[in-house]
């Protein structure tokens, strides 16, 4: 349930063109009996990804930082003083971005993240190391935040099996659980952002969101690789 990326920084850093470019292309040599071809291709792509390079330069925990930055640049979801819950927070990027934009501090934390994977401490973020699917997780999140959230964000994705439909169904299930949580805790006027995969089985989820929010649509930020089936569902203006 860990997040595929990390974030931090001001509300309008990075942006669509912020990844930069490099003429240096890294090739990963194949050694017989050591590296699977698929793993070699992934590593080579990762090493040559401009968002990966920029995330290191900017101090973000991973390239997915730019996904939230780009979505926020377009839709202005994050605002000073908001309270945020981050589901599937590892390695901490989205919590990092949220904390900086809303002005969360250790003295007055306004961001709570949860993941069963360990997340290194982040300024202004309360981190719960537990599975969001555990029965007690929702209440622990609310107790830690101390108020209803203005925004619930989720970059959760089930571990991939290599079977596209299976991966899609498992991730959609996480989306549904996250959506059920969001509609049970959000403040009126709040927003919900969640990762999903293309696959055409989200009808029930979309129906729920359209019933509960005034605006629902898919978003694919530039930082999401073009060849990836990854999408984000953005539901805005919770009816309460």
Curated annotation (Swiss-Prot):
Uppermost EC category: transferase
Keyword Membrane: no
InterPro entries in the cross-refs: RNA_methyltr_RlmE, RNA_MeTrfase_FtsJ_dom, rRNA-MeTfrase_E, SAM-dependent_MTases_sf
GO molecular function: rRNA (uridine-2'-O-)-methyltransferase activity
GO cellular component: cytoplasm
Stored Gene3D superfamilies: Vaccinia Virus protein VP39 (3.40.50.150)
Subcellular localization: Cytoplasm
Domain of life: Bacteria
Positions annotated as active site in the UniProt record: 195 (proton acceptor)
Keywords: Cytoplasm, Methyltransferase, rRNA processing, S-adenosyl-L-methionine, Transferase
Catalyzed reactions per annotation: uridine(2552) in 23S rRNA + S-adenosyl-L-methionine = 2'-O-methyluridine(2552) in 23S rRNA + S-adenosyl-L-homocysteine + H(+)
Compositional bias of kind Gly residues: 1-20
Residues involved in S-adenosyl-L-methionine binding: 92, 94, 115, 131, 155
PANTHER family hit by this protein: RIBOSOMAL RNA METHYLTRANSFERASE, RRNA METHYLTRANSFERASE 2, MITOCHONDRIAL
Role summary: Specifically methylates the uridine in position 2552 of 23S rRNA at the 2'-O position of the ribose in the fully assembled 50S ribosomal subunit.
Family per record: Belongs to the class I-like SAM-binding methyltransferase superfamily. RNA methyltransferase RlmE family.
Protein name: Ribosomal RNA large subunit methyltransferase E
């Amino acid at each position: 349930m860990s997040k595929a990326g990390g974030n931090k920084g001001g509300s309008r850093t990075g942006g669509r063109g912020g990844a930069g470019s490099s003429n240096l292309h890294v090739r990963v040599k194949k050694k017989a009996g050591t590296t699977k071809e698929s793993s070699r291709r992934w590593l080579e792509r990762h090493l040559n990804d401009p968002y990966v390079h920029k995330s290191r330069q900017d101090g973000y925990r991973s390239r997915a930082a730019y996904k939230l930055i780009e979505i926020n640049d377009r839709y202005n979801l994050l605002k000073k003083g908001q309270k945020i819950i981050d589901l599937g927070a590892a390695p901490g990027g989205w919590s990092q971005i949220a904390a900086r934009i809303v002005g969360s501090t250790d003295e007055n934390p306004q961001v709570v993240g949860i993941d069963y994977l360990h997340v290194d401490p982040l300024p202004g973020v309360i981190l719960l190391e537990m599975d969001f699917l555990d029965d007690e997780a929702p209440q622990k999140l609310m107790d830690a935040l101390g108020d209803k959230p203005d925004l619930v964000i989720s970059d959760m994705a089930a571990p991939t099996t290599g079977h596209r439909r299976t991966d899609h169904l498992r991730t959609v299930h996480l989306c549904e659980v996250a959506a059920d949580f969001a509609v049970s805790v959000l403040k009126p006027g709040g927003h919900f952002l969640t990762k999903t995969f293309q696959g055409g089985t989200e009808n029930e989820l979309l129906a729920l969101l359209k019933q509960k929010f005034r605006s629902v649509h898919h978003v694919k930020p530039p930082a999401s690789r073009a060849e990836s089936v990854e999408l984000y569902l953005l539901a805005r203006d919770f009816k309460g």
